[in-house]
Design a protein with these regions (language model features):
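ABC ATPase NBD coupling module
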Residues: 75-92, 118, 240-245, 276-282
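A short, proline-enriched helix->beta-strand linker immediately N-terminal to the Walker B motif
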Residues: 169-173
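P-loop NTP-binding/switch modules centered on Walker-like glycine-rich loops
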Residues: 180, 184-266
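The feature captures the beta-strand-to-loop junction immediately N-terminal to the Walker
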Residues: 39-41
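Conserved ABC ATPase signature
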Residues: 149-154, 158
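Hydrophobic anchor residue at the start of the ABC signature
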Residues: 112, 164, 175, 188, ...
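Short catalytic/signature loops enriched in Gly
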Residues: 144-145, 237-326
Length: 326
C-alpha cells in the first residue's frame, strides 16, 4: 500500500462465542495515513472486528489468529494489560453512540484528560490545556464552557466532537470511527465527516471508517472493504470498487445505501433476507441464500479471487450480474 508502513497486520482471524463463529478467516492490513472504509449491514461483523482489535470483546467471545501485529508488537504474545496499553497509546476510538464514552454525572473536564494522564503523556494541567486546544480544532469557539459542561447538556453533534477530541488526546497513529454519524442529522453528518478529513490532512493519521452506507464511504475513503456474515467478501480501492463491483453483495449494498440510491420521497430499499448469525463456519458461500446468481458451485469451498490492482473478491462468480448496476 502506498500510504506508508503497516500499522496493523492480521492474518487468519477467527472470532467465536461459545456456540457460533462470528468472524471467519479474516485478513486485514491498515497502513500509515490511509483512509479505510469498512462496509456491511448490521451483523456483518464490522464492529466485532474492531472490538477484537481494541481488545474489548464481549464477554464469552474469544479469537484465534495466525498473526496479529500492531505498531510493531506481536499481540498474540501480549498480556491483556500490554495489549490495552498499546491500544491506548496508538489508537483513538470514536463510538457510534455519542454518550458511549461520556459519563453523564461527570463534567467533560473530569474525563477528557484521563487517558492522557494514565498513559503518562503529561500532567493533568497539560492534559486540560491539550483538551482545550483540541476542542478548538474540532470546531468549538468556547472550549472552556464545553469542559465545564455535562454530556447531557450538549447536543448529539457536540458530543461527537467531544468524542473526537478525546480520541485525539494521545496523538494516535490510527483513529477508528464506528458509525460515527448515526442519529445525527444530514448537515451534522457532513460536518463530522469533513472534520475527519481535516484531521487526516492535518495530522497524517490513518482513519478507519465503519459504516453501513457505501455512499458515504465512496465520498470519504480511499480503500473499501465489504464484510458479510463475518467474512471479507470484497476489497479494493474505493474507485475500483464502485466502478467495477465484483461481489453480488457489494452491488446489493450499493442499492440500499441511502446516499447512493434514495430519492426524495422514496422509501429505502432492502436486501431480501437477513444476515445469518449461525452457520458462519462453512467454507461455502454464506451469501448464497440471498444471492440471485447462486448456483451449484456456490455450495463448494470458496477461494479468494485476485482481480488485480489490489482488488479481490470472495465469490465463485466474480462480476456476475454487473450489468444490473452498471
Amino acid at each position: 500500500m502506498s500510504e506508508g508502513r503497516k500499522l496493523v497486520s492480521i492474518r487468519g482471524l477467527t472470532v467465536s462465542s461459545a456456540h457460533r463463529v462470528l468472524i471467519k478467516s479474516l485478513d486485514l492490513d491498515i497502513a500509515q495515513g490511509e483512509l479505510l472504509g469498512i462496509a456491511g449491514e448490521s451483523g456483518s461483523g464490522k464492529t466485532m472486528l474492531m472490538r477484537t482489535l481494541l481488545n474489548i470483546p464481549p464477554e464469552d467471545v474469544h479469537f484465534k489468529a495466525d498473526a496479529l501485529q500492531m505498531f510493531g508488537a506481536d499481540c498474540l504474545h501480549l498480556s491483556d494489560t500490554e495489549w490495552r496499553r498499546t491500544v491506548g497509546e496508538h489508537i483513538g476510538f470514536v463510538p457510534q453512540n455519542t454518550m458511549f464514552y461520556l459519563h453523564p454525572m461527570l463534567k467533560i473536564r473530569q474525563q477528557i484528560a484521563d487517558s492522557y494522564v494514565s498513559h503518562r503523556k503529561g500532567t493533568l494541567r497539560q492534559g486540560l490545556a491539550r483538551a482545550e486546544a483540541l476542542l478548538r480544532e474540532v470546531g468549538f469557539d468556547d472550549p472552556e464552557r464545553v469542559l465545564n459542561s455535562y454530556a447531557w447538556e450538549l447536543s448529539g453533534g457536540m458530543r461527537q466532537r467531544v468524542n473526537i477530541a478525546m480520541a485525539l488526546m494521545n496523538s494516535p497513529e490510527l483513529l477508528i470511527a464506528d458509525e460515527p454519524t448515526t442519529a445525527l442529522d444530514c448537515a451534522i453528518q457532513r460536518q463530522i465527516m469533513d472534520l475527519f478529513m481535516k484531521i487526516s490532512r492535518d495530522t497524517g493519521i490513518a482513519i478507519v471508517m465503519i459504516s453501513h452506507d457505501l455512499g458515504m464511504l465512496q465520498q470519504y475513503s480511499r480503500r473499501t472493504l465489504v464484510m458479510y456474515a463475518g467474512r471479507m467478501v470484497e476489497s479494493g480501492s474505493t474507485e475500483t470498487l464502485f466502478c467495477t463491483p465484483a461481489h453480488p453483495y457489494t452491488r446489493a449494498l450499493m442499492g440500499v445505501s441511502p446516499s447512493l440510491s434514495l430519492q426524495a420521497g422514496q422509501r429505502l430499499a432492502e436486501i431480501p433476507g437477513y444476515v445469518p448469525d449461525s452457520g458462519r463456519e462453512t467454507d461455502a458461500c454464506i451469501f448464497a441464500p440471498r444471492c440471485p446468481y447462486a448456483g451449484a458451485e456456490c455450495s463448494t469451498a470458496l477461494q479468494e479471487q485476485d482481480l488485480g490492482g489490489g482488488h479481490s473478491c470472495l465469490c465463485a462468480k466474480p462480476g456476475i450480474g454487473g450489468h444490473d448496476h452498471g
